[in-house]
């Protein structure tokens, strides 16, 4: 247990982040990050109940000062940037607060969280950063003027960062899922056709578990059968 590498997962309290943290808990010491301490504590108990180890950080990743303070000194061999928020509505119905929330959590937080742990990875000459993006980062849709824009930004950030740090021993991957049956899709009446959070966690783990000489930079995960109607 003492020799386990450490993985930091943001947005870990539910959905994809929770599924990824549970999977990483089998092989890594996991630091789970989210705003909801009760949900994080439940997750930590689940990880520990099967022999894993876990620390909890209650944190709003949109709070720049809090991110720097909370992650100061945190050793991360793996970082999964998963935190995200979405208000899917036409631009004329979108409030300024909703716009800024998506930009701050979906994109700006990537910079602040990554910037907090990347120096340690570079110093050690190894590390892996995984961004959980979206197929919205490669497309557009009605009601996605801001959400899709933030996911396009995730792609540009990830691809540029990969080129900056690959010669320093640090891998950068981005996993772009399609529709996932989580609380994010609660407005859908039928979610049976969607991916599950575990499906996305499988893709994240595939990227992480590749040999050191192999980089899987981009994975797109879609439901095998599209939505009907």
Where do the language-model regions lie?
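The beta1-alpha1 cofactor-binding region of Rossmann-like NAD(H)/NADP(H)-dependent oxidoreductases
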Residues: 58-69, 96
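Active-site helix of classical SDR
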Residues: 114, 150
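Residue(s) in the substrate-gating loop at a strand-loop-helix junction
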Residues: 134
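Conserved glycine-rich Rossmann-like NAD(P)H-binding loop of the short-chain dehydrogenase/reductase
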Residues: 27-43
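C-terminal helical subdomain
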Residues: 167-170, 174-175, 182, 189-229
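Conserved glycine-rich cofactor-binding loop
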Residues: 13-14
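Substrate-binding pocket helix/loop in short-chain dehydrogenase/reductase
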Residues: 90-91, 98-100
